[in-house]
Amino acid sequence: FITSGDHDLTENIIHLVLARADDSPAGTKGISLFLVPKFIVKDDGSVGPRNGISTGSIETKMGIKGSATCVLNFDDATGYMIGAKEKGLSAMFTMMNNARLGVGGQGIGVAEAAFQHSTEYALNRKQGKSTIQNKHGTIIDHADVRRMLISMRADIFASRSIELENAKAIDMANATGEPEWINKAAFLTPITKVFGTEIGINISNLGVQIHGGMGFIEETGAAQFSRDVRVTAIYEGTNGIQAMDLVGRKMMDNGETAYAIINQIKEYIDNLSGVKKDLSVLLGLANETLRETVEYLISKKEVSERFGGAMPFLMGFANFDSLHISSFLFLSNVIFFFEMGQSTLLLCN
């Protein structure tokens, strides 16, 4: 139980700490993982003397104030090495990948909350004259408010579809052990983290805008979404670092995984051509642009040359991939409902 750095809810607190042994080399290659308890545990399992750990201060944060972030001081503390020596970062990244998926979901969750909060406000806030309800409606009748709400809803659906696709890839990788699924799960992980958190930040900002002046007043609660979600682009690996990981390590297969996803999108576009030809042509051109971008990045053998455009590439890839996933999910639901004889119910919904 390590929440909040220190507490008296349990007999002991166990900290996982990255540190370097005295005889290990400098840099990240020399980092090992240590278990550092608040109290030294005796041989018989009972709690012994206090270890050299103390809480230096509690940070005053912009948001997520329900979680205390502490400065911990380690003074001649005793730690126990976990796992192989100098493999601490490898062990940490196992945890980090899971955390990145969770943080992406956190961004989506805050976005959904901000959207619902804003929708309720727009349905009840009377301001100005309505052009569609005998001049006595609420701000949801205003075109720009509707635009923002529709944008929020679409972006949430898109980011959620990416996270679900990543979850599917992880499940399939665990079930089959096939390299294709393993690589896809790894490829989508930084995308899930970045896209979900960036969407959360953008949507919570739109939520403040929909509230107008009241959004700047703490009473409405709209500002809290912005404060709380802002850190998601920072912790568990900043979004910029995630984007660099995508165009770097995640493309060490010469773009094979990226091309596989692009080919899946092309299949969807080809199937769409018989229904919406004009739209399929535009999507086809965009998909080829995405393919050309991957080819350009792969051509830069010096990975650092890819980093300048890493973030725009990740967001563009996520937006386009989510378009095909969410459209596929929608069409699949349409087919399912009609096959179940529920066409009337579908149309009503």
Name each model-derived stretch.
Residues 253, 271-329, 333, 339, ...:
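C-terminal amphipathic alpha-helical interaction region
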Residues 150-168, 194-211, 238, 246-247, ...:
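Helix-rich, typically C-terminal accessory recognition domains appended to large enzymatic cores
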Residues 3, 41-56, 61, 68-99, ...:
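A glycine-rich, basic-preceded beta-loop-alpha segment at the flavin cofactor/substrate interface
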Residues 1-2, 12, 52-57, 89-106, ...:
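Glycine- and acidic
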Residues 64, 183-263:
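Alpha-helix capping/hinge segments and adjacent helical runs
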Residues 157-193, 294-308, 333:
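C-terminal helix-coil-helix/basic helical segment that borders enzyme active sites and/or dimer interfaces
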Residues 99, 106-110, 114-122, 247-248:
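Mobile "lid/hinge" segments at catalytic clefts and subdomain interfaces of large enzymes
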